[in-house]
């Protein structure tokens, strides 16, 4: 190996060590003039605010509590429904509004009221789930309707076959009701569907379905897990919901901050005045962010809040 190559390799190793141990700065100093004092913080749940056991680290709660004391709006921004927002987060004084089901529903959490929505017509949702049923691959699929998850009885006990994390399996099962045939239930009882979830055991099957769904312009397809796809109505994304909520509250985009780790957080990271990715985030999110903080297992949300908000 040439000396120059060795030096480059050493530099790469050093960079990896810094990324592992430190908060990684991606030039935020160059953008200080482009955003104002933070007045709204939107934070993803899974892989971001909560740890791998689906608990909110105390350090994160205390940091958000300190932000709320300064009058900053704390906004859960999640693929979960309103019911899936952790109770201890809802209890914080600065938490009133939520961006849920990937931006399909923006809600007033205190008054249990929908502020804006962008949902799938039930007929389109039935078409998509029928496509999954008939695709020939081992796919598990369900849907959220008015904040409640519905799945077929044949799927309910199969989550451990698709998801390795016991904590995530418990969370997913607690958010769903089993009915004999949820496609039939939606056809007969629903006008709109908040979001469709699909789970795959095979990556090739997942990519085949993503390609098919990508040919339907009325859909927005994203993902928060390596084994899933999340299907929303076109126009339902966290970034658009963040801007709509900020406008509703009279807050400039430049005064917003957003945290995320997954593909379904990408629009929000791009739209926020200050986008912060987690160290455990997917490459596209870390590339889009102005700043990369510590992982969800290291209370990375609190670390970035201390650096930029609680200075």
Kindly give the residue locations of the regions a language model identified.
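Long, intrinsically disordered low-complexity tandem-repeat segments
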Residues: 1-29
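Mg2+-dependent phosphoryl-transfer enzymes with acidic/Ser/Thr/Gly-rich catalytic loops
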Residues: 35-40, 56-57, 214, 230-311
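Asp-based phosphoryl-transfer active-site loop
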Residues: 37-52
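Short, acidic loop-to-helix structural element flanking the phosphoryl-transfer center
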Residues: 54-70, 117-124, 179-183, 235-247, ...
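Active-site phosphate-binding/coordination module
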Residues: 58-164
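Short active-site oxyanion
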Residues: 71-75, 94-96, 195, 254-255, ...
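Short, structured coil segments at secondary-structure junctions
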Residues: 92-94, 101-102, 110, 216-217, ...
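Conserved acidic, metal-coordinating active-site core of Asp-based
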Residues: 131, 138-259
């Amino acid at each position: 190996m040439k000396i120059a190559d060795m030096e480059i390799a050493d530099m790469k190793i050093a960079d990896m060590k810094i990324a592992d141990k430190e908060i990684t700065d991606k030039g935020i100093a160059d953008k200080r003039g482009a955003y104002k004092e933070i007045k709204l913080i939107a934070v993803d749940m899974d892989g971001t605010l909560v740890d791998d056991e689906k608990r909110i680290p105390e350090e994160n709660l205390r940091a958000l509590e300190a932000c709320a004391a300064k009058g900053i709006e704390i906004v859960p921004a999640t693929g979960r429904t309103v019911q899936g927002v952790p109770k201890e987060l809802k209890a914080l004084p600065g938490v009133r509004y939520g961006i849920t089901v990937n931006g399909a529903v923006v809600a007033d959490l205190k008054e249990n009221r929908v502020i804006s929505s962008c949902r799938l017509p039930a007929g389109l949702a039935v078409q998509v789930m029928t496509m999954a049923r008939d695709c020939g691959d081992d796919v598990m699929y369900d849907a959220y309707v008015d904040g409640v998850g519905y799945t077929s009885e044949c799927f309910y006990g199969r989550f451990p076959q698709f998801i390795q994390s016991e904590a995530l399996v418990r969370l997913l099962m607690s958010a769903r009701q089993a009915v004999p045939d949820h496609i039939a239930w939606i056809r007969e009882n629903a006008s709109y569907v908040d979001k469709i979830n699909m789970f795959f055991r095979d990556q090739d099957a997942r990519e085949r379905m993503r390609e098919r769904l990508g040919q339907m312009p009325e859909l927005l397809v994203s993902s928060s897990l390596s084994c899933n796809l999340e299907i929303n109505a076109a126009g339902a994304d966290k970034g658009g919901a963040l801007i709509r909520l900020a406008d509703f509250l009279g807050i400039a985009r430049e005064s917003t901050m957003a945290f995320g780790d997954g593909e379904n957080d990408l629009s929000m990271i791009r739209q926020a005045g200050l986008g912060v990715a987690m160290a455990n985030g997917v490459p596209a999110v870390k590339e889009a962010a102005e700043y990369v903080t510590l992982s969800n297992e290291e209370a990375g949300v609190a670390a970035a809040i201390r650096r930029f908000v609680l200075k």
